[in-house]
A protein has these predicted regions:
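Short, solvent-exposed loop/beta-turn-alpha elements that line the ligand-binding surface or hinge
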Residues: 27-38, 78-90, 109, 124, ...
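Early extracytoplasmic/lumenal segment of secretory-pathway proteins
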Residues: 1-13
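Glycine-centered hinge/linker elements that transmit conformational signals in sensory
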Residues: 96-103, 132, 136-186
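Short helices/loops that flank or line small-molecule/ion binding pockets
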Residues: 1-4, 71, 96-104, 190-204
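Ligand-binding pocket segment of bilobal, Venus flytrap-like solute-binding proteins
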Residues: 161-219
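Hinge/lid segment of periplasmic solute-binding proteins
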Residues: 10-65, 72, 132
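Extracytoplasmic/periplasmic substrate-recognition and gating elements
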Residues: 45-46, 50, 69-70, 74, ...
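Acidic carboxylate motifs that coordinate Ca2+ or other divalent cations, activating on Asp/Glu
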Residues: 112
């Protein structure tokens, strides 16, 4: 019969299931002005086997947010070096993130008269915790040294959730419960936004909302 819809809006992770019903994106749209600054990675997730089936509208990226007044502070850098023997800088691994978050957890390091904490994260069950866990696990389970699928083995479709990468990430996340604010293990996205955006933590990672909140005059 006749297809009831001309356009379908949905997540790119369903693209292989949907593509039998979809027409490739017309070249005039692929070459449009709006597409000029779309990154190759976002074009890639909108495509299957080299053919673009979806037109990206939301990058949906996770960002690392950090307190510049701490990380870039020479006095804090000196203190951190003296106490830990390590360099205080923007972390590039989850291990560095955890070490710094743990060090800055539970004391008033910005002089506002209140305790600050290491990290605000979405940890609430049945909320968006799955997305937060993927950000942690992808560094171990999907990188140039771990080719193939992320969720499944591409040859056998065996779930990868119990592989060393996911297990390592889960261990990190259990450790992270020690450097979040009180009640942090029940933080949903709104709580994470309010916590980092309100100046309560050194780090957070998720979408850009908490960064925007941190830029407000009352933060």
């Amino acid at each position: 019969g006749q297809a009831p819809y001309d356009i379908v809006f949905g997540f790119s992770n369903f693209i292989n299931d949907w593509r039998q019903y979809l027409a490739p994106v017309p070249k005039k749209y692929m070459n449009s002005t709006e597409m000029k600054d779309v990154t190759k990675s976002h074009v890639g997730v909108s495509s299957w086997d080299g053919t673009m089936y979806q037109y990206p509208v939301d990058g949906d990226r996770h960002y690392l947010k950090y307190r510049k007044d701490v990380i870039d502070n020479p006095e804090m850098q000196k203190k951190y070096k003296a106490d830990t023997g390590k360099t205080l800088k923007v972390p590039t691994t989850w291990k560095e993130y955890g070490e710094m978050a743990k060090y800055f957890n539970g004391w008033d390091w910005d002089g506002d008269g209140e305790k600050e904490y290491g990290s605000a994260e979405v940890m609430k069950k049945d909320d968006l915790m799955f997305a937060a866990f993927f950000s942690r696990s992808v560094a171990y389970a999907k990188n140039p040294r771990t080719p193939g699928g992320f969720f499944f083995d591409l040859e056998t479709m065996k779930p990868n959730i119990n592989n060393p990468g996911f297990v390592e990430a889960l261990g990190d996340w259990v450790e992270a419960t020690k450097y979040v604010p009180p009640g942090g293990i029940n933080f949903g996205l709104g709580d994470e936004i309010g916590s980092f955006g309100g100046g309560q933590t050194l780090f957070s990672f998720s979408w850009d909302d908490a960064f925007i909140a941190a830029m407000q005059d009352d933060s």
